[in-house]
Amino acid sequence: MSIQVFCDFDGTITNNDNIMSIMEKFAPPEAEEVKNRILSQELSIQEGVSQLFQFIPTNLHDEIIQFLIETAEIRNGFHEFIQFVNENNISFYVISGGMDFFVYPLLQGLIPKEQIYCNETDFSNEYITVNWPHPCDRLCQNHCGLCKSSLIRKLSDTNDFHIVIGDSITDLQAAKQADKVFARDFLITKCEENHISYTAFETFHDVQTELKHLLEVKL
């Protein structure tokens, strides 16, 4: 049995949700209703996020990148946490509902690209189009967009110990199949609604402390 860590990006590795930051800065007011319908699960994540990015003109590409480079902050303790998982030969994957054009640059030098799974974007038309290279498998019918539970099944064995770290509705399906969940913000609410056991965290120092204890118990 090996330990596999599957970590969200927006609002988890970064302090803020970068998609929401982009929408607040660059999208028209109508985007707010779409966001609320995603959170209430009236819209699937795939449908809702596709609609959100259709509000954003592609000619803002460079401006958006610069905005995120200036404003996105990596959560406290993440650098040390990555060093810890590497030293302990723990498999670590970023499974993000975020977009390639900002996830890769913000994680450059921290996480190898082959350990990052995110959505792809097309800037060839007037508005941003989202492509979905990691859809739901036959065991998930939630139209997740990037399906985190499907990726967990693809990247690990059933007898592995699965750890999920996340903050929002996009992490719920993954949390349902995890052996250990680290949750913050809206994911805490969803875990409680669905009777999913979780450990709350604010920094990756919190996660590292708990994971270190878990390793000691399992060893």
Curated annotation (Swiss-Prot):
<comment type="similarity">
    <text>Belongs to the HAD-like hydrolase superfamily. MtnX family.</text>
</comment>
<dbReference type="InterPro" id="IPR017718">
    <property type="entry name" value="HAD-SF_hydro_IB_MtnX"/>
</dbReference>
<comment type="pathway">
    <text>Amino-acid biosynthesis; L-methionine biosynthesis via salvage pathway; L-methionine from S-methyl-5-thio-alpha-D-ribose 1-phosphate: step 4/6.</text>
</comment>
<dbReference type="GO" id="GO:0043716">
    <property type="term" value="F:2-hydroxy-3-keto-5-methylthiopentenyl-1-phosphate phosphatase activity"/>
</dbReference>
<protein>
    <recommendedName>
        <fullName>2-hydroxy-3-keto-5-methylthiopentenyl-1-phosphate phosphatase</fullName>
        <ecNumber>3.1.3.87</ecNumber>
    </recommendedName>
</protein>
<dbReference type="InterPro" id="IPR036412">
    <property type="entry name" value="HAD-like_sf"/>
</dbReference>
<dbReference type="Pfam" id="PF12710">
    <property type="entry name" value="HAD"/>
</dbReference>
<dbReference type="InterPro" id="IPR050849">
    <property type="entry name" value="HAD-like_hydrolase_phosphatase"/>
</dbReference>
<dbReference type="GO" id="GO:0019509">
    <property type="term" value="P:L-methionine salvage from methylthioadenosine"/>
</dbReference>
<keyword id="KW-0378">Hydrolase</keyword>
<keyword id="KW-0028">Amino-acid biosynthesis</keyword>
<comment type="function">
    <text>Dephosphorylates 2-hydroxy-3-keto-5-methylthiopentenyl-1-phosphate (HK-MTPenyl-1-P) yielding 1,2-dihydroxy-3-keto-5-methylthiopentene (DHK-MTPene).</text>
</comment>
<keyword id="KW-0486">Methionine biosynthesis</keyword>
<dbReference type="InterPro" id="IPR023214">
    <property type="entry name" value="HAD_sf"/>
</dbReference>
<dbReference type="InterPro" id="IPR006384">
    <property type="entry name" value="HAD_hydro_PyrdxlP_Pase-like"/>
</dbReference>
